[in-house]
From Swiss-Prot:
Protein name (database record): Imidazole glycerol phosphate synthase subunit HisH
InterPro entries: Class_I_gatase-like (IPR029062), GATASE (IPR017926), Imidazole-glycPsynth_HisH (IPR010139)
Keywords assigned: Amino-acid biosynthesis, Cytoplasm, Glutamine amidotransferase, Histidine biosynthesis, Hydrolase, Lyase
Catalytic activity: 5-[(5-phospho-1-deoxy-D-ribulos-1-ylimino)methylamino]-1-(5-phospho-beta-D-ribosyl)imidazole-4-carboxamide + L-glutamine = D-erythro-1-(imidazol-4-yl)glycerol 3-phosphate + 5-amino-1-(5-phospho-beta-D-ribosyl)imidazole-4-carboxamide + L-glutamate + H(+); L-glutamine + H2O = L-glutamate + NH4(+)
Enzyme Commission number(s): 4.3.2.10, 3.5.1.2
Source organism of the structure: Leptospira interrogans serogroup Icterohaemorrhagiae serovar Lai (strain 56601)
Residue numbers annotated as active site: C79 (nucleophile), H191, E193
Keyword Hydrolase listed: yes
Subcellular location: Cytoplasm
GO terms for MF: glutaminase activity; imidazoleglycerol-phosphate synthase activity; lyase activity
Xref: SUPFAM superfamilies: Class I glutamine amidotransferase-like (SSF52317)
């Protein structure tokens, strides 16, 4: 069974619908025992980094996720679920005295806002994916270099560990990690469930891998 985490983030329906194309053995849940008994975990959704981590910490779900990862089971983060895989983010609530928020820390790197001096922020719409280390990739099998995926975000990873990056995106000549894969940790900055053929192929690859 695949557990799709209910942690208060938005835009969940399209993810559930896309996963259902490849398996009926999944559940949208925040129940700790259900997550512990799952064979894979997906962190979906749109939202803010600080709120996502606040929800995970206050509900004890962070410890449950850590236990899942330590056991070697696959974890897949999408959009905000991708960003919280990293060490920290500067996306904090207005009025907060903190300079950054701690993430799950499974992938080295920090989440920072696009500077937006010469281009529009947020980055919304279709963009090409530059594939790296395709022979090492689980998610990108059968997907061609420069394929288009759908993005919507204002923040991106910086100083990310190179060996974990299997896909990059170029937004106004600023390259940022868009796909990471490290042992049993997987993530995409874009929304595969909104990315039509290529996105659905990526989701299928993950589900077949489990």
């Amino acid at each position: 069974m695949i557990a799709i985490l209910d942690y208060g983030m938005g835009n969940i329906h399209s993810c559930l619908k896309a996963v259902s194309l490849y398996t009926k053995d999944f559940v949208f849940t925040k129940d700790h025992s259900t997550i512990e008994n799952s064979k894979a975990l997906i962190l979906p959704g749109d939202g803010h980094f600080d709120k996502a981590m606040e929800n995970l910490n206050s509900t004890g779900l962070r410890k449950t996720i850590d236990k899942h990862v330590t056991s070697g089971k696959p974890l897949f983060g999408i959009c905000i679920g991708f960003q919280i895989l990293f060490e920290s983010s500067e996306e904090i609530a207005q009025g907060s005295k903190k300079e950054q928020i701690e993430g799950l820390g499974y992938i080295k790197g920090k989440i920072k806002k696009f500077h937006g001096k010469d281009f529009k922020v947020p980055h919304i719409g279709w963009n090409r994916l530059q594939i790296r280390r395709k022979d090492k990739s689980v998610l990108l099998k059968g997907i061609g270099d420069q394929s288009f995926f759908y993005f919507i975000h204002s923040y991106r990873p910086t100083d990310a560990e190179g060996n974990a990056i299997t896909g990059l995106c170029d937004y106004y000549q600023e390259k940022f990690p868009a796909v990471v894969e490290k042992n049993n940790i997987f993530g995409t900055q874009f929304h595969p469930e909104k990315s039509h053929t290529h996105g659905l192929k990526l989701l299928e690859n993950f589900i077949r891998f489990i």
